[in-house]
Amino acid sequence: MGNRAVRKWKKTRMVTAMLAVCSIFFGIIVGCKVKSNEKSEMLPIITIGTDQFEPYNYLDSKGNNVGVDVELATEAFKRLGYEPRFCVISWEDKEQLLSDEAIDCIWACYTMTGREDKYQWAGPYLYSRQMIVVRSDHDIWKFDDLEGKRIAVQATTKAEDLFLHRIESDLPTVSQVNCFSATEDMFAAIRKNYVDAIAGHEAMLRKFVDDGEGAYRMLEESPYRSALGVAFRKGTHAEL
């Protein structure tokens, strides 16, 4: 990604963050485990379950959490008098961790669409498209070319639901839907030709495509557009 593109992306990211913070998170924390009106020199901590992938949440060279979701969460909870603590979780365990109160919320480029009744949501704060990435040397250009192919997705995501046809779309029937825990694992699989295509959030995949120096390309079609939100345990934030 060139310097101009990076600057433009950062500017857009900050504008989006401020708009989202001002319009969504006013008063959302009533009912959390730690009361925000406690008088203490230390801010009460809210634990955020997250998954690491750029540009939403990742570690910089100093080991600090940075990214779109990190900036949004930090600013939102700062205004509400909380100190966010980011906890990288196993994505497959997110619901159990939330239920057990090991985390207070899930903030990780998490899709609200189709899960509206499953959690107490704050959002949407951004929108995302599900996209498909293939190797540049593969003859796959449109959805129909995916018929009978092997697909890599991240476990328990919308991409998995789409290719297992739990969600209606124009995608054809494929021969395999291989579920991985991390984006890096999916790209390792396609690099070794274990799978023919990868499906997932556009921004997440775009970073790997851009860093791939021409090894990968993204199909033009999108099978699904989704709203992103912050998930709390149902019944804990009735004022939303």
Spans of model-derived segments:
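Extracytoplasmic small-molecule ligand-binding "clamshell" domains
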Residues: 38-110, 117, 178-179
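Short loop->beta-strand "edge-of-pocket" segments that line small-molecule binding or catalytic clefts
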Residues: 46-52, 66, 144-160
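Periplasmic-binding protein-like
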Residues: 50-52, 126-134, 202, 206-240
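Ligand-binding cleft/hinge of the Venus flytrap
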Residues: 58-61, 73-82, 159-180, 209-214
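Hydrophobic residues within well-ordered alpha-helices
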Residues: 76, 98-99, 146, 190-191, ...
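A ligand-binding cleft/hinge motif common to bilobed small-molecule-binding domains
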Residues: 93-96, 109-118, 162-166, 189-224
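Flexible hinge/capping segments at coil-to-helix
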Residues: 123, 134-151, 235
